[in-house]
Amino acid sequence: MPAGSRRRLLKAGIGLAGLSLWSPSALADQNWQTFKRRFVVDDRRVIDSGNNNVSHSESQGWGLLFAQSYDDKETFAKIWEWTSKSLQRGDGLFSWRWSPNTADPVPDKNNAADGDILIAWALARAAAKWNEPRWLAPSRRIQSAILDRLAVDFQGRLILLPGAQGFARGNRYVVNLSYYVWPAIHDFAERAGDQGRWRRLEADGLWLLDNAAFGDYRLPPDWLLFGPQAFRVADDWKPYFGFDAIRVPLYLAWHNQASRLGRFVTAWKTPRFGGRPPAWINLDDGSVAPYPSSGGYAAVAAVTEFMADGGKNAAPVAEITGDDDYYSASLKLLSNLAGQEGPHAKRT
């Protein structure tokens, strides 16, 4: 599952719409309808428009989460039906990618931990929101499979593997900190059957994140190598805070981790960046992408600053525009949900 093949970097930047003339609830409904019209095929398959219209377990997880959050039960049921039939493996986890243009749409059966977590979380939230027990059992099965297949005891820490295959490097492991969906993991730790292991996964993941501080801006990389005498950017990936790691502060904000957000806000507020994250920062030499980041990045920056300040006043609200592709639009919707739910989340 090469990281570079998961998404295409956006090469055209756009501004954050922010607060608009719409009321927050009306804008939320408009955003969801826009997202669904552009990125949800037949109300079932969520497409990555920046990557040949493939679907990921991640895109399906986000689609489920959005449908649940915006009270669209019919679309939720359709997305889940397609996801379970097209991507779910025998062990309960999900193949990470579905391609519409190949003879076998799922040639790589490996999973992606963030997709698994997002799907399990969306199902649990839907079961509670709509009082639908039919979605709780599959959520619990996925949660158990995540702990069984992806949670590894290593050097006194319980770490989350990005996928079941391909991330061991001898006596070291490659970790992707953006795959830790903190509000979901915390919810599992509060409600799941194996609360102790979820709590360990949360606490040890936050320890990894706190120590993953590289370069002049002390930021986490997209991919981290962890092991004996090894705590560094993973060798097989570029030393970037970029397309993956931008989700780290987003999920921290959603989890109400104000004390952990300061380094991101400080980095983005340097005169060089003017408050907006670059598309990527090279953590080795400080160079940045020669093209601007998307409006989704700006939405993440806005909610990060909002939650770093304690979630006071009105949360920023980003509007999906015609310039947003799937990933940028998703970051906007996720940031809006983080701003809505983050101030009420329990701190760890």
Regions of interest found by a model, annotated:
Residues L93-I142:
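Substrate-binding cleft of extracellular glycoside hydrolase catalytic domains
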Residues L64-S69, L118-A128, P183-D187, L250-W254, ...:
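Short glycine/serine- and small hydrophobic-enriched flexible loop segments
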Residues R347-T348:
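Short, solvent-exposed mixed-charge patches
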Residues M1-P2, R8-A28:
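N-terminal export signals
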Residues Q30, N53-E58, D114, L136-K312, ...:
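Extended ligand-binding clefts on enzyme/binding-domain cores
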Residues W32-A113:
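N-terminal carbohydrate-binding/catalytic regions of secreted carbohydrate-active enzymes
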Residues Y70, T83-S86, G90, A126, ...:
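Alpha-helical solenoid scaffolds that mediate protein-protein interactions
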